[in-house]
Design a protein with these regions (language model features):
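Amphipathic alpha-helical regulatory segments at dimerization interfaces
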Residues: 2-8, 52, 77, 125-128
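Amphipathic alpha-helical "output/dimerization" segments
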Residues: 93, 97, 111-131, 137-145
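Short loop/turn motifs at secondary-structure junctions and domain boundaries
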Residues: 7-8, 43, 68, 78-83
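Short coil/loop residues immediately preceding or within conserved phosphate-binding loops
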Residues: 11, 48, 73, 86, ...
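Regulatory sensory and allosteric helical modules in signal-transduction proteins
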Residues: 19, 23-27, 35-69, 73
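Short beta-strand-to-loop transition segments that serve as allosteric relay/switch motifs
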Residues: 100-110
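Helix-loop-beta substructure at the N-terminus of cytosolic sensory domains
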Residues: 1-27, 37-38, 133, 151-155
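A short, aliphatic-rich beta-strand micro-motif
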Residues: 84-92
Length: 155
């Protein structure tokens, strides 16, 4: 679903971060450079794009990571990679934000209303898929790149 969110929004990459107390931990990373993930550092609830979506329980857009003052905590990730913009929607369960689904772009970008609405639907499905996961620790994030997730030859 994370990959599908990326592809349908014409994004370069996408992420699913899980809420773990006051911070978000990477769970699934699709087609993003490790330098970007390392550079954004620990995402606290209420900071950066995903943390603000979780805190506000609504979509959050960062159209240009290099100029948006609300992305200051993650600017190193943008400087250390080609990623420049993103938008995030909260994944809600029982009225609580449990994760954030985000799409990332290589140039300044503002998503369309349909891209946001589609990701909100994906977030509902992800919420259902994550039910019961609260009792297990967040594993190391799963990094995926298109060549690693391509269909087998002959398909």
């Amino acid at each position: 679903m994370v990959r599908l969110a990326c592809e349908l929004a014409s994004a370069h990459g996408s992420t699913l971060f899980l809420v773990e107390g006051p911070v978000l931990r990477p769970y699934v990373i699709y087609n993003l450079p490790k330098g970007y993930i390392d550079g954004i550092g620990t995402i606290r609830v209420g900071t950066q794009c995903c943390g603000r979506a979780v805190a506000q329980k609504r979509p959050w857009i960062v159209s240009d990571m290099l100029t948006d003052p609300l992305f200051a905590d993650g600017r190193k990730g943008a400087l250390d990679s080609p990623i420049r913009a993103g938008f995030s929607v909260p994944v809600l369960s029982g009225g609580q934000a449990i994760a954030a689904l985000a799409c990332h772009y290589m140039s300044p970008h503002t998503p369309s209303a349909i891209d946001i609405e589609r990701n909100e639907v994906f977030a509902k499905l992800i919420s259902i898929a994550l039910r019961g996961r609260e009792r297990t620790p967040v594993p190391e994030p799963y990094f995926a790149w298109p060549e690693r997730v391509a269909a087998p030859s002959g398909s």
